[in-house]
Every structure is written in structure tokens, then in C-alpha cells.
Amino acid sequence: YTTLFRSVVRCIDESLALTYQNTLEEISRCTGKTYRAIHLIGGGAQSALLCQMTADACGIPVYAGPVEATVYGNLMMQLLALGEVKDLKEARDILKASVNVKVYEPHDTQQWREWAQRRKENGIKS
């Protein structure tokens, strides 16, 4: 890949991470709750760079995976409907035991807080 391509991808990932940070802040404000982790599922969970940037920007761990979350969710709902799984807790326990999830711990959060503050000062919300 070219340097330009890599720069564009990095710009997109940084923007997404800062948008996630802003969204997390808004959700926390609206609910009055503090969140201890983010679960990133689907295609974005395949990007180590995006996952690490999100952990750094939000200052909390990111649990990445499963990539095929829609398929797993659909399967669990069908198993619930058929009575093969007794409740949502059991479905979640089955998934936790069956799916590999990678954890990204936050680092260098101060730099990300400064970038987020600069975005707010410039009127950028997401």
C-alpha cells in the first residue's frame, strides 16, 4: 500500500475512535452510568489499529469480536425460540465460551483527550 493510502486509513480510524469517544461520553451523560468497556463487533473488530485507537481514545478496554456477530445473534435467537437454550444468560454464556475475543487495553490516553478537546473547541461533535 502507498503512504497516501495508509495515511487515509489512519485518518479514518482516528476519526472513528474520536467519534466513539464522543458517543460514549454522550451516552454516559444521558444514562448517568459509567461504562467499563466497549464491545466492538463486526468488521471493525478485525482492525487492530481501530480497536487500539478506540481503547486509547475512550480510556477503557475494547473487546474485539466476534466478527460475525449478526450470525451468532441470529443463531442464539433461533435456539431460544426452539427451547434449546433456556434464556439469554445461557445464550451469552455459550457465546463467551465459543468465540475468541481479543482485548485491547488503553494506552496514551492523554493525547487522545487533548485531540477530543480540540475537536470540541472547533465545533466537531462526531
Pin down the residues of each PLM region.
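Internal hydrophobic alpha-helix adjacent to the cofactor/substrate pocket in enzyme cavities
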Residues: 20, 79-84
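Acidic, glycine/GT-rich loop-and beta-edge segments that sit at the periphery of enzyme/chaperone cores
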Residues: 84-126
